Amino acid sequence: MYQNRLKGYKHLGYSIKQNISENTERQTESKLYSEEDYKSDFQKDILSAASKIIISVPCLSKVNVQEFVLSSTTLLVKGVNIQILVRKQDDDAKQKKIAPCISMLENIGIKVIEQENISQKITIIDEKIMWYGNINFLGYTENEECCMRIVDNKIASEIESKILKP
């Protein structure tokens, strides 16, 4: 239900109200995105990470994981800690399908944590930028999906602590 409202707001041109104390630089902008227009800003945020990236997704796709591996190699060299939380698949066929993706990530030094009941799609960068919505950042996406980019240390830190609980 919430995701449908978010899509509707995006289509109507709504935006996220900025905190009055924030400056208006592009890096501090909170915004609504569609599946069609999120990728370039998402990539910029990922590549600008200084210390930590946490991505929580229910599933992985080979194409998106390969793309992420290519872009994250330089981050790992810089010492950025990258963790991927992915849903532990409940049947063997699905588990076999994502196993190569998990191996690709782990082989370059990304920590992959498989957990039950992961359904939310969240990315948190440096405990200050959070991407949240129904776009699977490392998996399959469909038309009309959307997400929010929220720049707020307090919200990002609080959500991070909740998704990292086992």
Say what each PLM segment does.
Residues S157-P166:
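Cysteine/selenocysteine-centered motifs that mediate thiol-based redox chemistry or coordinate metal-sulfur cofactors
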Residues D45-N107:
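Primarily the HKD phosphodiesterase
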Residues N19-S21, L85-R87, Q115-N117:
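Conserved beta-strand termini and adjacent loop/short-helix elements that scaffold enzyme active sites
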Residues I53, I110-A156:
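HKD (HxKxxxxD) catalytic microenvironment of the phospholipase D
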Residues M1-R26:
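A conserved SF2-helicase RecA2
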Residues I16, I82, M130:
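Hydrophobic anchor at the start of a short beta-strand
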Residues T28-E35, P58-K62, N107-I110:
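Short, flexible loop segments at the rims of nucleotide/cofactor-binding pockets, characterized by
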